[in-house]
């Protein structure tokens, strides 16, 4: 996958946890839980998940998150001082900072989803893998209710976007239905 994405190979760590999850750390390594490995049923699904995480690394999301967090923190400190530095001002700044950070994170998740779909097409792989992987994880974890504080967009919105992106690239592709 790294050669398709034109990036360095990322070290892979397997963490023994039941909860299905995967993440990229410091933009330099990927961790996958055994719970995710047990949940996924097709090689294309693991390719999709790893492509999504590689997308975070390739697109520089770790650096962007750190930079954004620092900027939001500094702005928050300044605003808190402008509004008197009291507990209410601090609360308002914290809420605003959390909303801003979550919004940035949601955008990055969509970018990583798009990266995974596009990478599958580029590599001649089945682009439905990321779709069915997310669908399985969504069914396992339950429905994420829309909230400004969520770091990920609601799964149904992500799935619809992926479905549309796949069909734009190749209308003949049939999205598998999972049980």
Where are the regions a protein language model picked out?
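Residue-level signature of catalytic and energy-coupling elements of molecular machines
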Residues: 32, 112, 154
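Post-HEXXH active-site segment of zinc metalloproteases
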Residues: 62-93, 131
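Catalytic and substrate-binding regions of cell-wall glycan-acting enzymes that process beta-1,4-linked
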Residues: 143-165
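Peri-catalytic and regulatory segments of divalent metal-dependent proteins
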Residues: 1-70, 122-123, 139-143, 147-149, ...
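Generic alpha-helical structural context detector
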Residues: 48, 72-76, 80, 117, ...
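Short helix/loop segments within enzyme catalytic domains
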Residues: 1-7, 90, 94-151, 171, ...
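Alpha-helical membrane and juxtamembrane elements of multi-pass inner-membrane transport
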Residues: 30, 44, 69-72, 90-94, ...
């Amino acid at each position: 996958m790294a050669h398709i994405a034109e990036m360095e190979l990322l070290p892979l760590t397997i963490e023994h946890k039941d909860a299905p999850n995967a993440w990229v750390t410091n933009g330099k390594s990927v961790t996958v839980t055994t719970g995710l490995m047990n949940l996924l049923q097709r090689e294309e699904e693991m390719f999709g998940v790893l492509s999504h995480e590689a997308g975070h690394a390739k697109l520089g999301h770790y650096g962007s998150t750190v930079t954004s967090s620092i900027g939001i923190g500094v702005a928050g400190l300044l605003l808190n001082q402008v509004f008197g530095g009291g507990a209410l001002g601090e609360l308002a700044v914290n809420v605003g900072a959390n909303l801003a950070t979550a919004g940035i994170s949601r955008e990055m998740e969509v970018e990583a989803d798009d990266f995974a779909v596009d990478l599958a097409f580029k590599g001649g792989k089945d682009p439905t893998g990321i779709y069915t992987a997310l669908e399985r994880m969504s069914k396992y974890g339950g429905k994420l209710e829309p909230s400004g504080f969520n770091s990920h967009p609601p799964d149904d919105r992500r799935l619809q976007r992926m479905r549309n992106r796949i069909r734009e690239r190749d209308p003949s592709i049939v999205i598998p239905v999972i049980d």
